[in-house]
């Protein structure tokens, strides 16, 4: 397709074997291999996006660039509080290992943090603690996959889960509970990723602070975030924990791997978490804000899920399926409730209809969902109740059938023998040939030719609308001086003119 804005499909990362997924040898066909599938690239949709470094626009993956950038950023933060005989916990999250289906950049950043702490402070007692949500085995799976247990040393790298022992922390809103083993060192380093991820929950308010109420918190405190508060006010929980005297007495600095919808863009590090948060917020408005706005404008299509992750955490163009489904401007705080959050789900009746006009329905353009590859371990029955769903193969059906969090999924879905059969059925009843594939591809999105043409036609107006109308509103709602952030030295150097 030389000279065209419609390209050959992008080959996604291969399936990852997981205790939560199907046997990978049963995945005999990927969705990008379907007839008629092409890709649309971000260089054509939004050419103003910053150049990715991993993979670059030629598809090259040079992990040394991640280390070089991380070393540069980490040598600029203050580590003077750390003494040579001190203990340090580097706090990570499992989400960092699933960016574009390739956790190598996040793993490299974690290793670099360890190495630079040793270089600058002489401290040797450095541990890695990786938090998870509902899939308690996943963190240890990624630690072994990237050999972080070997890199950090025996017993120094392990997962932490919400049901692990907790300790009380006095905060401005009362006693909350964090994980004991996250905070059992003298110092902590907050090591995370900046993609919008669950923006349907956090609404990009203090996004960089969220792991303090998620990855590092006990179940009781995580539950207040998800169920006691609405999607805009819940972020007070994370801020209260982070600003507590206990956590502040241990906090040193933060280091983030920074993607755009296209690929990894940079690494950011700062002692001031709120300054870092401002930078990633503006960056995400200018990048994720555009592809997410474009998604809300799509009409009549079939979704194919084909990624190593739970159903809500399947990626297309860097955006998870849960956000795609919401079909509203998730950055606009005037929008009260997305169509999907655990909080919103409680407001649907037994027929699957919102009980209040304040609850938005899921994306009306979704006419069918085809599940070729996904993991269990996350409540997902909501989607099979809302959208006609076809599961590819008994191996995939068995994943959901045996999953305690999805016991009723098969009551609302059918099983096809293989992917072509599933697609043939979906085309017939959905009455559309437009397809979008959630497979984590980097650089662009695998879609049908008809949907690629629709996206290319919509993109210029979306870009103008986001730049001139939406971003000023989003910034004002959060009390952010986005022009000052954009003109700051770190933002210009680290996010726009990346030094390699």
Which residue ranges define each predicted feature?
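C-terminal non-catalytic interaction/assembly regions of soluble proteins
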Residues: 14, 19-35, 318-500
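N-terminal amphipathic/basic leader segments beginning at the initiator methionine
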Residues: 2-65
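An acidic, phosphate/nucleotide-engaging active-site surface
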Residues: 136-203
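Glycine-rich phosphate/diphosphate-binding loops that line cofactor/substrate pockets in enzymes
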Residues: 70-91, 122, 296-297
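Membrane helical hairpin/interfacial module
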Residues: 103-154
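C-terminal functional extensions of proteins
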Residues: 233-303, 308-309
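Divalent-metal (Mg2+/Mn2+/Ca2+)-assisted nucleotide/phosphate chemistry catalytic cores
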Residues: 174-261, 271
């Amino acid at each position: 397709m030389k000279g065209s804005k419609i390209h050959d499909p992008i080959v996604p990362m291969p399936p990852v074997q997981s205790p939560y997924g199907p046997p990978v040898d049963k995945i005999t066909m990927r969705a990008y291999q379907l007839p008629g599938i092409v890709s649309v690239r971000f260089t054509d949709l939004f050419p103003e996006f910053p150049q990715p470094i991993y993979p670059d626009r030629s598809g090259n993956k040079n992990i040394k660039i991640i280390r070089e950038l991380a070393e540069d950023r980490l040598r600029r933060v203050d580590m003077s509080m750390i003494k040579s005989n001190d203990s340090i916990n580097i706090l990570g999250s499992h989400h960092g290992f699933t960016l574009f289906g390739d956790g190598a950049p996040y793993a490299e950043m974690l290793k670099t943090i360890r190495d630079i702490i040793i270089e600058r402070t002489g401290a040797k007692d450095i541990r890695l603690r990786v938090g998870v949500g509902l899939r308690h085995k996943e963190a240890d799976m990624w630690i072994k996959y990237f050999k972080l247990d070997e890199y950090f040393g025996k017993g120094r790298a392990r997962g932490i889960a919400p049901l692990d022992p907790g300790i009380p922390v006095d905060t401005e809103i009362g006693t909350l509970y964090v994980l004991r083993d996250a905070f059992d060192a003298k110092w902590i380093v907050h090591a995370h990723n900046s993609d919008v991820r669950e923006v349907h929950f956090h609404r990009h308010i203090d996004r960089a602070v969220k792991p303090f109420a998620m990855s590092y918190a006990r179940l009781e405190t995580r539950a207040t975030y998800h169920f006691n508060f609405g999607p805009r006010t819940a972020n007070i929980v994370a801020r209260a924990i982070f600003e507590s005297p206990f956590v502040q007495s241990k906090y040193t600095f933060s280091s983030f791997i920074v993607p755009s919808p296209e690929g990894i863009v940079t690494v950011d590090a700062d002692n001031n978490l709120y300054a870092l948060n401002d930078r990633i917020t503006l960056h995400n408005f200018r990048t994720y804000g555009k592809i997410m706005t474009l998604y809300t404008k799509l009409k009549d299509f079939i979704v194919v899920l084909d990624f190593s992750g739970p159903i809500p955490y399947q990626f297309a163009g860097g955006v998870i399926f849960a956000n795609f489904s919401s079909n509203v401007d998730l950055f606009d705080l005037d929008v009260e409730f997305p169509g999907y959050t655990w909080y919103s789900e409680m407001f649907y009746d037994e027929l699957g209809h919102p009980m209040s006009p304040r609850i938005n329905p899921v994306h009306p353009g979704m006419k069918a969902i085809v599940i070729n590859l996904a993991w269990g371990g996350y409540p997902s029955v909501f989607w099979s109740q809302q959208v006609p769903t076809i599961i590819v193969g008994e191996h995939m059906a068995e994943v959901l059938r045996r999953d305690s969090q999805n016991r009723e999924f098969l009551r609302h879905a059918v099983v096809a023998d293989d992917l072509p059969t599933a697609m043939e059925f979906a085309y017939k009843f959905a009455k559309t040939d437009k397809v979008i594939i959630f497979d984590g591809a980097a650089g662009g999105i695998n879609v049908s030719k008809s949907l690629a043409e629709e996206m290319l036609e919509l993109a210029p107006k979306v870009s103008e609308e986001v730049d001139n109308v939406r971003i000023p509103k989003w910034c004002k709602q959060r009390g952010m001086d986005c022009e000052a952030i954009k003109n700051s030295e770190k933002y210009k150097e680290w996010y726009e003119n990346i030094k390699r």
